[in-house]
Regions:
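Modules that initiate DNA replication and primer synthesis
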Residues: 1-24, 64-97, 428
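Feature primarily recognizes SF3-like P-loop helicase cores of small DNA viruses
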Residues: 13-65, 95-496
Length: 496
């Protein structure tokens, strides 16, 4: 900033930069040439640097990077270029300080010699390194208030539903890509509203739920402990919708609330580490992310229910950046999986605990239905602010009504649960009701294992105890001569 009143020095020079003037006045106040807090060595210079730049510099111990504050956001100082430049800037201001301060000539002469020697690259780096302890911050200290949303022109407080200006103490490293929409007329982007109506096929309840769910995803805490699965064939509008939301929330920039990650995070794999307490590097880049999209799952993929429960359940997780120490953080994000193929699930507690909600996208755009101008329309800065307002309105709807899934979402989720209820599927494929008949436990379980291990299915069968407990949903059990039976059932002829 260069709008400060010029500061005239005794030697005739003039300081015009506001930050330079503030630092220079601090030097005059602190008198570093005779202050025991700023000894004439690397540590003393480091302490002085920390004092002068305490409002704009932090060193993060978790990723070993400097962060510099500028206009509402803390940004990583790549290669320490700005931090080193500001150390040199401090030395230049110290030279000017020597011409301004009242002190005996011999002391100032020696102090100027010390300053000149400190300008060498080696001493400069050592002094900068010494300053770190006074400017330390943890990665989890950034973007830590889940109810503050940083915009280009200020901060939206989601608790108070009020807008204010940002301060360095907010410790934002993330921001949406547009201004907070003050006084915007929603008719300014009719196309967004008509687009949502089209992809929801005029279903007002489903469209309202979609808006509530996406507005809820602006929060930096997954209070509902759930994720969302958007399911539908290609050209259903899913990609345009979620890419637009991601763009508004800053995905693809270095400092956005939107992020993406490989769906292997929530899918089973024989190569996957099952120790959920082990550091997981994949998660390191999700710290602070609120809206997290997962890459589309492959056909036949199996969801890792334990991973989903941990990630949605706000369990502390360990992660680390490359060549950096591990640290613990609590995921803030809400996950969105958009897919053409429903992944398999082998644990129905995922559904019983309402960890997942399915939103079906049944519209198919083809031929004349396709609007190739949508991307360009929605990426216009004015329209992005309108879309942000739509998201904030969705959040307000969530605050007023909760997620409150409509019947269409509950039914879609129930259908998904049903096709993944393998015990029920086995029953429907292989068994039929037969009053007066019975099947022994051993025979029934062996048929179940055969059914699971069929090449077309490739399921891992549950243990016998779990199987018998699940089968009691359908048939009563009895014992005769130490043999257990299920009553009122027989194998279908083609299953024998």
């Amino acid at each position: 900033m260069n709008d400060a009143q010029p500061y005239m020095l005794k030697n005739g020079m003039c300081l015009t930069n506001e930050e330079d003037i503030a630092i220079f006045e601090l030097l005059l106040d602190q008198q570093p040439h005779c202050n025991v807090n700023y000894l004439w060595n690397d540590i003393g210079l480091g302490n002085l640097f920390a004092e002068c730049f305490s409002g704009t510099h932090r060193f993060c111990v978790d990723n070993q990077k400097w962060y510099i504050y500028n206009r509402g956001i803390w940004k990583v100082d790549k290669g320490d270029i700005q931090a080193q430049g500001n150390m040199q800037r401090l030395l230049q201001l110290l030279h000017l300080y020597c011409t301004e301060v009242n002190a005996d000539a011999e002391t100032i002469k020696n102090y100027k010699t010390y300053i000149s020697k400190s300008s060498s690259d080696t001493i400069l780096r050592r002094a900068l390194n010494a300053s770190k302890n006074n400017l330390v911050i943890n990665l989890t200290d950034f973007d830590s208030d889940p109810y503050l949303l940083n915009c280009r022109n200020g901060v939206y407080d989601m608790r108070e539903q009020k807008f204010r200006f940002a301060t360095p103490e907010d410790y934002f490293t993330l921001s949406v890509t547009c201004d907070y929409p003050t006084g915007i007329n929603v008719r300014q982007c009719d196309r967004w509203y008509s687009f949502v109506d089209e992809i929801m096929e005029g279903d007002k309840e489903k469209a309202a739920f979609l808006q509530r769910a996406l507005g809820y995803s602006l929060l930096g805490v997954n209070r509902e402990e759930c994720m969302f699965l958007a399911y539908g064939r290609t050209r259903s509008g899913k990609g345009t919708l979620f890419n637009t939301i991601a763009k508004v929330l800053g995905m693809g920039t270095d400092n956005g609330y939107g992020g993406s990650i490989n769906s292997s995070l929530v899918c089973e794999s024989k190569f996957k580490d099952k120790d959920y307490n082990a550091p997981e590097p994949m998660l390191a880049d999700t710290v602070g992310i609120r809206y997290l999209t997962l890459s589309e799952t492959k056909k036949g993929a199996l969801l890792d229910v334990n991973a989903i429960k941990s990630l949605t359940g706000r369990d502390p997780r360990k992660t680390r950046q490359l060549h950096c120490p591990a640290f613990t953080f609590t995921p803030q994000f809400t996950m969105w999986l958009s897919t053409n193929f429903l992944p398999k699930v082998n644990d129905d507690t995922l559904f019983k605990s309402d960890r997942l909600w399915v939103i079906e996208f049944n519209k198919h755009f083809d031929g004349d239905d396709r609007d190739y101008s949508l991307k360009e329309i929605f990426e216009h800065p004015d329209n992005q602010a309108v879309i942000l307002k739509w998201l904030l309105d969705g959040y307000k709807m969530y605050v007023a009504d909760g997620l409150n899934p409509p019947s269409c979402v509950k039914e879609a989720t129930a259908r998904y649960a049903r096709i993944n209820d393998r015990i029920l599927c086995f029953k429907e494929d292989c068994l039929e009701d037969a009053p007066g008949e019975r099947i022994s436990n051993g025979l029934l379980y062996s048929k179940y294992k055969e059914w699971c291990e069929d090449e077309e299915r490739g399921y891992n069968p549950v243990g016998s105890t779990t199987f018998y407990t699940e089968m009691e949903r359908f048939y009563k059990r009895s014992r005769s001569h130490s043999i257990g039976y299920f009553n009122g059932v027989r194998l279908k002829i083609d299953a024998e």
